[in-house]
């Protein structure tokens, strides 16, 4: 009798079902500088660097995000092709662009919000699904920009709404980080929010001339906070990936 109970117990035990025999899904990140990896001597952090800490196995996260990239240049420079080549069935891909797509004054980088940008997102979704992997779209994180009255100013134009529209159209899970980070910055306020951003903190070599404060890129506490918001979204969406969250 015992020999028949053993396989049943093995099947029913959550701890054993997540054992070494099961390959955890891998999470691949496609995005820009707000998500990218940086050398540890650089105080700047992308939120993708902090995401692994929210999962049972930090090595699940593979960060392909590259500074300065848009949906156009991420493909053109070969990063998208390399990401696709690493995918295995059951993996997840989180796609976050917008910061550089909105630079339409730079034709080699920017994309039109009504045509090329959503078309590129559709391509990403289609090609990820063709690999039997799961795409997640993410809206771009908010910049720390407040007006004189202390009101947070949106800076991404129509790009977040374009992402939301593609997510609805193609039934793609959406991590609405523009909404979430905007709410977070409003809650922190003008002064308290400074500690999360590079601001005037030196990054790399000292500039030859004073630079404008950087209210786009994160220090470690900011990256950790955004990664936590992404993890909350994954849990709230009840995605299969959520079972691997701590």
Regions found by a protein language model. Give the residues of each.
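Bacterial N-terminal signal peptides
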Residues: 4-15
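Generic detector of short, well-ordered, non-transmembrane alpha-helical segments enriched
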Residues: 15-16, 219
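Serine-esterase "nucleophile elbow" of acetyl-processing enzymes
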Residues: 18-66, 81-93
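Alpha-helical cap/lid subdomain in secreted, periplasmic
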Residues: 22, 78-246
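Short, histidine-centered active-site or binding-site loop motifs used for metal coordination
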Residues: 31-33, 68, 101, 141-142
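Acidic/histidine-rich helix-loop elements
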Residues: 36-45, 65-74, 103-113
């Amino acid at each position: 009798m015992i020999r028949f109970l053993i396989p049943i117990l093995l099947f029913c035990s959550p701890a054993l079902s997540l054992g070494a025999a099961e390959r955890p899904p891998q999470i691949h990140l496609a995005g820009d500088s707000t998500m990218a990896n940086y050398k540890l001597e650089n105080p700047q952090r992308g939120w993708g660097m902090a995401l692994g800490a929210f999962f049972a196995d930090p090595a699940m996260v593979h960060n392909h995000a590259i500074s300065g990239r848009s949906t156009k240049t991420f493909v053109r420079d070969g990063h998208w092709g390399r990401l696709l080549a690493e995918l295995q069935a059951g993996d997840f891909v989180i796609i976050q662009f917008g910061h550089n797509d909105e630079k339409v004054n730079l034709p080699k980088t920017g994309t039109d919000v009504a045509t090329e940008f959503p078309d590129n997102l559709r391509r990403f979704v289609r090609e990820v699904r063709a690999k039997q992997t799961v795409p997640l779209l993410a809206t771009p994180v908010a910049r720390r920009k407040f007006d004189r009255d202390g009101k947070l100013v949106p800076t991404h134009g129509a790009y977040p709404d374009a992402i939301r529209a593609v997510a609805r159209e193609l039934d793609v899970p959406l991590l609405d980080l523009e909404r979430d980070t905007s709410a977070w910055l409003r809650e922190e306020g003008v002064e308290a929010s400074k500690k999360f951003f590079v601001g005037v903190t030196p990054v790399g070599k000292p500039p030859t001339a004073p630079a404008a404060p950087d209210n786009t890129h994160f220090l470690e506490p900011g990256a950790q906070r955004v990664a936590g918001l992404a993890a909350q979204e994954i849990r709230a969406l009840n995605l299969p990936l959520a079972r691997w969250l701590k």
